[in-house]
Amino acid sequence: MILVIDVGNTNTVFGVYDGKKLLNHWRMETSKGKTSDEYGMFIVSLLSYEKIDVGKIEAVVIASVVPPIMYSLEHAIRKYFKLEPMVVGPGIKTGINIKYENPREVGADRIINAVAALELYGGPLIIVDFGTATTFCAVSSKGEYLGGVICPGIKISAEALFQKTAKLPKIDLVKPETVIGRNTVSSMQSGIIYGYVGEVDYIVRRMKKEMKEDNIKVIATGGLARLIASESETIDEINGLLTLEGLRIIYERNK
């Protein structure tokens, strides 16, 4: 069995695989203040609760976009699992030719998503990840990572609206029944949700034109993927566990 860990700006997701089967996964808030013991005891308690023997974990794979967390997390793995974690970064085999001007600038999560999507769906692809930031990644039919787009995430956009407009209330990110709002809350929900749907569809269409390939599949992942995909005209499929799957595949290519 292997433990995979995806450290994002907002949440950290843990998953355990037995071969290609995901046994379970858990989510916690990403916190820069946690000690290695806090991480270690948290992970061990999760596994114990699910009756997963810690001693049967053969490897740990970590991807992170939050560097300050890595020292404590890596130390936790060494202390509680007696393993040297595999950290996705330079030197790790991904099987993808990165066409970015500076490949080191590409976030590990974006490459991992591309690895998983190529394995599961084949190219060409556009991957839309609805995280703290929303990212769009273009992958060619040859398996090349072409580049992409980075936008403020839905929650960041909503928070900016709340903070900069004194009279507007905080609202839940819920899709209203109509675009035309009949009160302040539904008008704000409409602007945030349907405005974001329009942004996603426009960017995807432009990317498809620039990629100049046929049958480009669009895969959505991330916490708010279902909310947007339900209204999107361009998203073909949702896979909320794409990053965990990518970590498993990368481990197989590097073990």
From Swiss-Prot:
The protein's annotated pathway: Cofactor biosynthesis; coenzyme A biosynthesis; CoA from (R)-pantothenate: step 1/5
E.C. code: 2.7.1.33
Catalytic activity: (R)-pantothenate + ATP = (R)-4'-phosphopantothenate + ADP + H(+)
Keyword Transferase in record: yes
Broad class of the protein's primary localization: cytoplasm
Gene3D superfamilies, A to Z: 3.30.420.40
Keywords: ATP-binding, Coenzyme A biosynthesis, Cytoplasm, Kinase, Metal-binding, Nucleotide-binding, Potassium, Transferase
Domain of life the protein comes from: Bacteria
Key word Metal-binding present: yes
Entry's Gene Ontology cellular component terms: cytoplasm
Names of required cofactors: NH4(+); K(+)
Cofactor, how bound (note): A monovalent cation. Ammonium or potassium.
Active-site residue numbers: D109
Chain positions recorded as substrate binding sites: Y100, G107, A108, D109, R110, T184
InterPro entries: ATPase_NBD (IPR043129), Type_III_PanK (IPR004619)
CDD domains per record: ASKHA_NBD_PanK-III
Molecular function in Gene Ontology: ATP binding; metal ion binding; pantothenate kinase activity
Enzyme class, broadest EC rank: transferase
Protein location: Cytoplasm
Pfam families named in the record: Pan_kinase
Sequence positions that bind ATP: D6, V7, G8, N9, T10, N11, T12, V13, T132
Its biological purpose: Catalyzes the phosphorylation of pantothenate (Pan), the first step in CoA biosynthesis.
HAMAP family given in the database record: Pantothen_kinase_3
Family affiliation: Belongs to the type III pantothenate kinase family.
Subunit structure: Homodimer.
Designated name of the protein: Type III pantothenate kinase
